[in-house]
Amino acid sequence: MTRDYNEIIDWMQLINKANTQLLHYRDMTIKANELATIQGMHIDLAHVSNSSNNNGTENKLIRYLEIKEQIKKIDKAVEPLNERQKQILILTYFNEYRASEYIIMNVMNLSDRGDYINLWDDALIDFANNYYDKDIIISCLSNLELRVVVVQGVR
């Protein structure tokens, strides 16, 4: 699909803007969600947000400490993986992060979900093409249900 340059904002700038504005999510949730995948549980990104805790600072601190503990566990869990396995794990996370599109849409001021999907797909494919070998890209993009069991060598 060809898009007019004036109709879209350069997606690399958008991704960089999103990453900059979402550091409080990324620092804690990237590894927490990798751990969640390994453990078969889900970490709700909204719980990390300052505006999502009804009981104020105490809940935020408890959630932060929980995630910090999970980060320690994920560090140990991925330590023995080789580089190829880590690549699969990262692309698996990319696929799962797409579920958090409302966060990215808000940061990027995208009003149309279709624009978001096009932007995301372009960014994911370009990211994969630039940083990962073709076999991994094909396996990840053709199977969005890829899970960490593949990383662990169990098919």
What label would you give each PLM region?
Residues 1-80, 109, 132-155:
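N-terminal interaction/assembly modules
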Residues 79, 93-94:
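Short, locally clustered residues in the helix-turn-helix/winged-helix DNA-binding domain
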Residues 88-89:
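A short pre-motif secondary-structure segment
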Residues 92-93, 108, 120:
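A general structural motif at alpha-helix termini
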Residues 95-96, 126:
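A short structural micro-motif
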Residues 96-115:
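Helix-turn-helix DNA-binding module
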Residues 116-134:
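DNA major-groove recognition helices of helix-turn-helix
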